[in-house]
């Protein structure tokens, strides 16, 4: 059925001008929609989950070096044994990245199959995936404190940002819902004080815009539907305007001396 659906998608989308990976994403969507729901509960095979991320009509679960993908109806779609020493995942709408934080390899996976496997020049520390399929990768660098590379949905290099020690090392990243901008929270040490610098990187220009700095570590950040960016630091929550001449902090809420330990995004 997958082969038949692939052929139909190729004709329906005029795939001569579109990527095979995008066609596979569309086939995945059709397969998930047409497959009978197995229902819940299910034994995923992962007894101690390290991370779970939602995608369109599905989710990916990681435990140790194992990953499984299930539809929201309970159908098993994919299973991966990476062998990575320190695996991590980052998910977008229809694909996710499985990467090794103790190595230089990453895998771009659709909901049912591998799309790309890439070996970087140095150790990977962080990845993010856009809903439109772009992938941001942070690696070690001999020329700067960190190197951030953004790839398009076909894993072709789109832009590179070599961060200085003053700019910091990216700790968290989040693509905007329209996949045209990337928010980057980078930490640096200034005078013995840990500082978080928050940037927005327009993918069409590649020139980062600094939204502000905070003497606290970001625990979570995400884009709001109106283009604002919400960042949850250890000591307060801050809402940022990300565009125009008024880019910067818009509103904040102090935790009153409390410290935020973790965030659950459900």
PLM-predicted stretches and their roles:
Residues 1-47:
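Sequence/structural signature of beta-propeller modules
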Residues 30-44, 73-81, 112-119, 157-163, ...:
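A short beta-strand motif characteristic of beta-propeller blades
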Residues 62, 99, 137-139, 185, ...:
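Residue-level marker for isolated small/hydroxyl-bearing positions within beta-strands
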Residues 187-266:
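Extracytoplasmic/luminal low-complexity segments enriched in Pro/Gly and acidic/polar residues
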């Amino acid at each position: 059925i997958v082969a038949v659906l692939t052929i139909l998608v190729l004709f329906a989308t005029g795939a001569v001008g579109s990527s095979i990976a995008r066609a596979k994403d569309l086939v995945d969507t059709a397969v998930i929609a047409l497959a009978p729901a197995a229902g819940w509960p299910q034994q995923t095979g992962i007894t101690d989950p390290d991370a779970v991320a939602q995608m369109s009509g599905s989710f990916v679960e990681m435990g140790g070096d194992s990953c499984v993908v299930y539809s929201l109806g309970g159908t098993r779609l994919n299973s991966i044994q990476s062998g990575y020493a320190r695996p991590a995942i980052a998910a977008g709408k229809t694909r996710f990245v499985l990467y090794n934080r103790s190595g230089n390899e990453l895998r771009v996976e659709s909901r049912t199959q591998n799309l790309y496997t890439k070996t970087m020049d140095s150790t990977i520390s962080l990845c993010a995936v856009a809903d439109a399929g772009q992938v941001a990768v942070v690696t070690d660098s001999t020329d700067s404190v960190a190197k951030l590379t953004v790839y398009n949905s076909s894993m072709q290099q789109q832009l590179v940002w070599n961060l200085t020690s003053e700019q910091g090392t990216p700790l968290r990243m989040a693509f905007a819902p329209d996949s045209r901008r990337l928010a980057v929270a980078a930490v640096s040490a200034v005078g013995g004080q840990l500082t978080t610098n928050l940037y927005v990187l327009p993918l069409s220009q590649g020139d980062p815009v600094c939204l502000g700095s905070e003497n606290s570590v970001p625990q979570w950040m995400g884009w709001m539907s109106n283009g604002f960016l919400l960042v949850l630091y250890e000591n307060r929550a801050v809402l940022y305007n990300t565009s125009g001449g008024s880019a910067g902090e818009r509103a904040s809420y102090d935790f009153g001396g409390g410290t935020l330990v973790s965030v659950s995004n459900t």
